[in-house]
């Protein structure tokens, strides 16, 4: 199979690659190797121009129905032409005349090997390819890209490293090899914003064919970019939509998939070769309907993302190509080498467009003295913002560990600094309106954020990062703050240096950084359920294997005790969030209850019917003792009395002191048990 991407098929980055139409005179002056490059045009031409086409006779000349209107006729017999008319682009025989393209149309039959194509066929493929606008050259202008993919506006000018000819060749060779690909690159080289667009281009040209050595039938499937959060789906799809010269989704090659998607974000005329931006959960529901699978933010180890990797690896023959993208492989390289079958590793060298300066602010308190450490950290933060201040009209991002700390640090900073203060995290509504204020303000803006801003939203005027170096890692019925990993540091640092030079101020000792094994602090039921659905062998088929396998097996026993069939579980997985696995017992009771419970999981609207149903599950928690936290909050120290984690201690906040027991409705809603 052809492994190298000829120059004429580069994606137009509008910097040193442009859309281009080649003339027959240019073809005549090419070397044999250059001419042979046009043989690969047969694949996109068959898919997008000759599919369902036929021969017509137009003004006495045989042509393809895509060239001219006319009555369908039987094709003429073809030998070697007696004359070539380069100006009219026609082959002339004693009895008839045929267009270059029609000649190629008749010669390019199933099982024809492309290395057998002669000059006569190649000239016709050149004409057909010109009509499709699939060729490129190092000369041209942006406006030449209008119409390449049906776009009304030109492609964006992209100087990033991932769209250089060298990177395009390397990525194409990996894509066409059908090996799993692990792609890394510094923040700012265009991994997420450009590589999916490049794979869309390759899929448009060559996707669906089992080989590029000869003509075969094709089975066209879209590309999917699977992402951990809805915010990322919306952000990256919009970026690529605009960069491909579209202003609306309908009729474009871009589609979105996530739960409760609004009508206006549904592409009602999607392209078979297009790219779907999807949340991980919805990616899993139709995983094998896609030809190329791209999984982004691999370093985050989102639970469903890791499951997709495991499923794709187990069933790799059902997917043409898999790309795993991450900023760094610091934590996962060795595991990926062992886990994936013959993986290809690609690194796109490069850095952010602008220089990033680093500043270390030492905290003299040991982190083991948690409260004292945080108080010193807050004092250091005020000093750092005073010393390293964003310019007027710009912003800085303060990374803290949790949503609660966002409010704590904002309150602290507001009392000591004269700048505009904002909070952005995953639970904040109308983030766009907050950003409008940030962008329109002539003042300095300071944005306090949980790790959400590592990747979910790009702040265009940010010049400074103030990184506390911690993250809250949830665990069943609790969680803990931990210092970040190297990959998380790279993500946070990379928020600056994209538009202007930036400054990264960090408040933690680098020796504190460590890899975070999220699977060791997660509910494991999804691993069990998806393993059943996709015939995974546990634990060896998991990308990341839990340290404590006892919990995995206890989870399996707990799920088996529900007495729900695998078929029903699969339907539940496809249709509902099931943030608590116990909800499955209710989803199977009645369609009406299932609809109300689903609405509760999506919107938080708790009806009396749903509350009573959940209370019937008896998800009981024993209150051991409590203490007063502030005016309207009491901390309750409790013990879980149900499920896999029966006996686990938990800390629950409530607006008044409680004794005895409470029932769990969700991870944030608890109902005291009446002691009477």
Curated annotation (Swiss-Prot):
Q: Which family does it belong to?
A: Belongs to the DEAD box helicase family. DEAH subfamily.
Task: Name the gene behind this protein.
Answer: OPG084
Q: What is this protein called?
A: RNA helicase NPH-II
Q: The motif DEXH box: which residues?
A: 296-299
Subunit? Monomer.
Question: Where is the Helicase C-terminal domain positioned along the sequence?
Answer: 366-542
Q: Where is the Helicase ATP-binding domain?
A: 172-347
Summarizing the function annotation, the protein's role is: NTP-dependent helicase that catalyzes unidirectional unwinding of 3'tailed duplex RNAs and plays an important role during transcription of early mRNAs, presumably by preventing R-loop formation behind the elongating RNA polymerase. Might also play a role in the export of newly synthesized mRNA chains out of the core into the cytoplasm. Required for replication and propagation of viral particles.
């Amino acid at each position: 199979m052809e492994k190298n991407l000829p120059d004429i098929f580069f994606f137009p980055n509008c910097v040193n690659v442009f859309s281009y139409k080649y003339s027959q005179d240019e073809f005549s002056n090419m070397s044999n190797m250059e001419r042979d490059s046009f043989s690969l045009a047969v694949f996109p031409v068959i898919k997008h121009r000759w599919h369902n086409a036929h021969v017509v006779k137009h003004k006495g000349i045989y042509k393809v129905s895509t060239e001219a209107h006319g009555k369908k006729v039987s094709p003429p017999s073809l030998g070697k032409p007696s004359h070539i008319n380069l100006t009219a682009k026609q082959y002339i025989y004693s009895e008839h005349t045929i267009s270059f393209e029609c000649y190629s149309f008749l010669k390019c039959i199933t099982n024809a090997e492309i290395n057998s194509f002669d000059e006569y066929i190649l000239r016709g493929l050149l004409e057909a390819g010109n009509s499709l606008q699939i060729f490129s050259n190092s000369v041209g202008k942006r406006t030449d890209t209008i119409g390449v993919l049906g776009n009304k506006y030109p492609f964006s000018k992209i100087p990033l490293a991932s769209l250089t000819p060298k990177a395009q060749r390397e990525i194409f060779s990996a894509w066409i090899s059908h090996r799993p690909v692990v792609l890394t690159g510094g923040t700012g080289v265009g991994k997420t914003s450009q590589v999916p667009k490049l794979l869309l281009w390759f899929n448009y040209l060559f996707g669906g064919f089992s080989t590029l050595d000869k003509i075969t039938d094709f089975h066209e499937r879209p590309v999917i970019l699977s992402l951990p959060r809805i915010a990322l789906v919306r952000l990256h799809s919009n970026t690529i939509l605009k960069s491909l010269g579209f202003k609306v989704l309908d009729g474009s090659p871009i589609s979105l998939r996530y739960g409760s998607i609004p009508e206006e974000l549904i592409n009602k005329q999607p392209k078979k070769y297009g790219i779907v931006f999807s949340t991980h959960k919805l990616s899993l529901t139709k995983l094998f309907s896609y030809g190329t699978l791209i999984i982004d933010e691999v370093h985050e180890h989102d639970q469903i993302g890791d499951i997709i990797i495991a499923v794709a690896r187990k069933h790799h023959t059902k997917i043409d190509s898999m790309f795993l993208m991450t900023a760094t492989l610091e934590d996962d390289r060795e595991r990926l080498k062992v886990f994936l079958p013959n993986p290809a590793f690609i690194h796109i060298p490069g850095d952010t467009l602008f220089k990033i300066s680093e500043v270390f602010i030492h905290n003299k308190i040991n982190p083991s003295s948690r409260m004292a450490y945080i108080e010193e950290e807050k004092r250091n933060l005020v000093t750092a913002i005073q010393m390293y201040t964003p310019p007027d009209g710009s912003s800085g991002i303060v990374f803290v560990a949790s949503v609660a700390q966002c409010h704590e640090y904002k309150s602290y900073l507001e009392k000591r600094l004269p700048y505009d203060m904002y909070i952005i995290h995953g639970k904040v509504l109308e983030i766009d309106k907050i950003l409008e204020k940030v962008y329109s303000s002539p003042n300095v803006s300071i944005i306090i954020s949980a790790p959400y801003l590592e990747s979910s939203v790009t702040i265009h005027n940010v010049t400074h990062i103030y990184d506390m170096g911690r993250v809250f890692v949830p665990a069943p019925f609790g969680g803990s703050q931990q210092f970040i990993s190297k990959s998380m540091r790279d993500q946070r640092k990379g928020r600056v240096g994209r538009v202007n030079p930036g400054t990264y101020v960090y408040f933690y000792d680098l020796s504190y950084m460590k890899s975070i094994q999220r699977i060791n602090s997660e509910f494991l039921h999804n691993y069990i359920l998806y393993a059943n659905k996709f015939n995974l062998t546990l634990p060896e088929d998991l990308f990341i294997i839990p340290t404590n396998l006892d919990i995995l097996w206890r989870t399996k026993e707990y799920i088996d005790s529900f007495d729900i069939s695998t078929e029903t579980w699969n339907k539940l997985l496809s249709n509902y969030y099931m943030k608590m696995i116990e909800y499955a017992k209710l989803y199977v009771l009645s369609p009406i209850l299932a609809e109300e419970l689903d609405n509760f999981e999506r919107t938080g609207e708790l009806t009396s019917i749903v509350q009573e149903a959940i209370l019937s599950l008896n998800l009981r928690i024993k209150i051991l003792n409590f203490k007063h936290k502030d005016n309207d909050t009491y901390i309750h120290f409790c013990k879980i009395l149900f499920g896999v984690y029966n006996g686990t201690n938990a800390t629950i906040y409530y607006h008044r002191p409680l004794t005895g027991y409470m029932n769990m409705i969700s991870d944030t809603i608890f109902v005291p048990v009446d002691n009477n």
